[in-house]
Each structure stands twice: as C-alpha cells, then as structure tokens.
Regions:
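Membrane-interfacial helix-loop segments of redox and metal-homeostasis proteins
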Residues: 1-173
Length: 173
C-alpha cells in the first residue's frame, strides 16, 4: 500500500514539454504583437469598438486563455497533449526531469502580463497591448531558444526568500 501525502512533491515532468509549449506560445505571441503593432493598439483616441476589433487583441486573448488552460489543467493543455502524444514518443528519454511547479508558475506570470496588456488596451491605453505581448514573447522565446525560463527563475527566487512555500520543498538545484 502506498501512502500519499499532501506535502509530497508533484511528479516530475519532461523539461522538453514546457520548452515545446514555449516555442508555440512564442510564435503566437509574436503574431499577436505584430497585429497589435499594426492595429488600433498604438493609436490614441480609438473607440472601444476599434480596440475590440484589433486582431492583436484577439490573438493575445487566445494566448491568454491558453495560459489559463496551462496553469489550471496542465495535463489537458493543448501544447502538452501535442508534445506527449506526437513529439515525446519520437525522442530519447530525457536526461533529467523537473519539478512542474515552476513552469506552472511561469504560465501564471505570462497570463498576468498579457492580461494587464489586454485590460489596459480595452481601457484605451495606447501601446499597452504590444508592450505586454512583446514582454511575454521575450520570456517565451528565452525559454524556447535557450532553456531559460524567466517565470521559473522568478518562482525559485520567491521560494528561496519564503514568499512562496512549495509543499514538499524545492528540489536541490
């Protein structure tokens, strides 16, 4: 009989999964930021209708909803399912596994950044949408291209100073 504890660490994950998700997310963020730069998001005096009709708003709203899906149900999030079903079976086993909590926190950070941009855009703040999209793109690109997860580093830093108290503690790094 196995005993489970609420203080146990969650099962580790293949670190290539979040990197794959970051790659797709970076591409979507780049497209959304491009559309935001060419739409109503950079102009002053736009109407609410013009701001809501901005294609960049819709692309970044979809990305934001994907962030929510990613941190509320990572097992069913589309990029994770795609990675596990189509990509991971074709790869060698990972050299190391990682704690899933930092990548999940990174999804929350991405959601927060893009949500602030969306809300400010709807409120009529020029440049809020492309700036938020670009900031989220930089973070996703760093993860996808260089395996540097900015949100994960933020999580680890906050855990080390005690702002976040992960159940089961942190794995040794």
């Amino acid at each position: 009989m196995t005993q489970t504890s609420v203080d146990a660490r969650p099962a580790p994950i293949d670190p290539r999964g979040p990197r794959f998700a970051a790659s797709v997310t970076a591409l979507l963020l780049l497209v959304g930021t491009f559309f935001a730069l060419t739409g109503a998001a950079t102009r002053t005096g736009t109407t609410l209708g013009e701001r809501l009709a901005d294609p960049g708003f819709w692309v970044l709203l979809i990305v934001d909803l994907l962030f929510v899906w990613g941190f509320t149900s990572p097992r069913t999030a589309p990029w994770g399912v795609l990675f596990r079903s189509l990509i991971r079976p074709r790869l060698a086993p990972p050299a190391d596994l990682e704690d899933p909590r930092p990548p999940r926190f990174a999804q929350i950070v991405g959601f927060t950044v893009v949500t602030v941009g969306l809300v400010l855009h709807v409120a009529g703040v020029p440049w809020a949408l492309p700036v938020a999209g670009a900031a989220a793109f930089v973070a996703a690109f760093l993860n996808a291209a260089f395996a540097f997860c900015l949100g994960c580093q933020l999580y680890l830093g906050l855990a080390r100073v005690g702002v976040i108290r992960p159940r089961g503690g942190l794995a040794a790094t």
